[in-house]
Amino acid sequence: MLYPDVTFEEFARSIGVSLRAGLVAAFGPEAGIDAAAEALAYGWEHWARVGQMENPSGYLYRVGQTAARRARRPQGFLPIPPVDDLPDFEPRLLPALEALSEAQRVCVVMVHALGWGQTEVARLLDISPSTVRTHLARALTHLQRELEVNDHAD
């Protein structure tokens, strides 16, 4: 989608939350928020060029990925929260999510945890909806196997 007559501020208001959500899903809260800020700063600085791109939000997502990877710490992407702050959930879930590929993790978190549509996720990641479906299917198969979840619970 071209944004030739849209100011950067209008564009950022329309995609800022999506961009941040995708990068947080990929890299965790701290690195994802920082990466989104860097991506938006890059977009603001280069808006004359970025605004003419076919998918500027997808491009800025890639800018954010690069920023997050440069800053990535050696430990896992999810910080270990204090036990008292956690809702009840399967304790093996976080390690199982970390074991997914970045694309699979982003698709699962955005679709199943944040309630996004597959088309919205595809647009943000600059991939086809069928690729999102493939990532979801593979990720869910992996998670079911790791968490020993049966599709047909009695």
Q: Across the structure, where does each feature detected by a protein language model lie?
A:
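A short, charge-rich alpha-helical start-of-domain segment used by transcription regulators
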Residues: 1-21
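Conserved RNAP core-binding helix
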Residues: 12, 20, 29-46
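DNA-recognition helix of helix-turn-helix
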Residues: 65, 125-154
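Short amphipathic alpha-helical boundary/capping segments
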Residues: 23-26, 92-100
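A short pre-motif secondary-structure segment
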Residues: 107-111
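Arg/Lys-rich amphipathic alpha helix in sigma70-family domain 2
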Residues: 45-52, 62-81
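C-terminal flanking helix
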Residues: 16, 20, 24, 40, ...
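Internal acidic/polar
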Residues: 70, 74-97, 117, 152
